[in-house]
Structure formats: structure tokens, C-alpha cells
């Protein structure tokens, strides 16, 4: 059976530590039932150059431990330690392969690098209904949006059950309708959210961009003080996926 050995070089989440190696080697020596296909580790700070010294220490420990395993077990497996940020910041540690994760989706943790990347995914919805409310009227649960003028409101059938954070409500987040920004009004509901389209020419059935070229996943992450990974992985399974091939 093929197996993959993960080494804990400082992340302290999963893997064999240095003091585990003698027992691991003893267990594997002469065991013909398994074959080591790869040795890997994971970097804790590859995206943060303020911790470059720690990152380098992880790479050095990985080199030491993986080399020890290879020598004592007389094997030549694939070795890998770098994720997306590691590929950019520590190219000298690419070994036999790298793990391009969020980079596959056109997202980088580096603002300068991001200029050369495009988001590969777009989250879309449509306008379900448009209504006009008067000054003093409210929108949504808790009346958290109170109109200060006559306001045209569009309802979009997507909400926090689909992965849209409630923290984007009350004017924090926005969507794009016909190339224009529409601010989210009041609270994001479970299955719907409402936006201000007072100054936007639009009609029911028009496409709504939740994220894509604008706003990007990274921009939404900054609004929520989180990371792009969380935005992407929060999109629930009930959201239909459409894949395009070139």
C-alpha cells in the first residue's frame, strides 16, 4: 500500500516530530506491505515575511528529517513542503513538487503579485424583485436600514445559508449590478439579501455579481477582516456550480 509521511516541522498540527523518527523507521524497515510515496510537511508562516527566520527553520528541519528517512529506509520518495505563498517566497525549497492551493483560483496573499492574477471563479445571482420604499421606511430584520430618502430596493435570492456572511450587511458589503456598486441594506437574511439600486438602471432578472472581477474574493476578505480561503470555502453546497473548459 502507498503511504505518505507527514513531518511536523513547526506547525504543530499534524505529523511525526523528530523524536518520533526512530520508532517510525523501526516500524517501516523491512515492512513490505507499505511503500513510502512521499514525505511532506506544511509551513506555518510562508505568507508572512516577518517570520522568515521561522519559515527557513522549518525548511531546514524538513531537509534534515526527510534526508534521514530516505537514508535509513533506502528510499527515494517525492518530497514537498511549499504551498502557494511558499512557492513565491521560498523557491529554493520546491523539492520534487509543490502544492499550489489557493493560487489555482487566482488569489495571492501578496498585493503586488495579485496584480498579475485573475480570479477564476465568479459567484452570481439575479434580482428577484424590485420595490420602492419611502423616506422613514425600513428594510429587513430589526429595521436595521432606515431610508433617508425614497429608495429603490432590489432583493437578491442568496444569503448566509449560501455562505454570504451576515457581517457584510448594514452597508459593509456590496454587489455589482450592471457594472455599478449596489450597497447591501440591513441584515443579510438566510436566503436573501437586499441592496440599494436607487441610482442603477436595472430590472428583475438582471445578473448580480457577488464576487469575481469586482469585488474580488480578496476585497471581500478584507471587508470581513478574514482570509480569502474562508470566503471560498464558505460557499455552501446548495449553490449551483458551473464549470467552463477552454
Segments and roles (model prediction):
Residues 132-246:
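C-terminal accessory subdomain/extension
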Residues 1-2, 9-126, 133-134:
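Active-site loop/helix belt of alpha/beta enzymes
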Residues 7-9, 84, 158, 213:
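Residues immediately flanking
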Residues 4, 93, 172-176:
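Amphipathic repeat-derived elements
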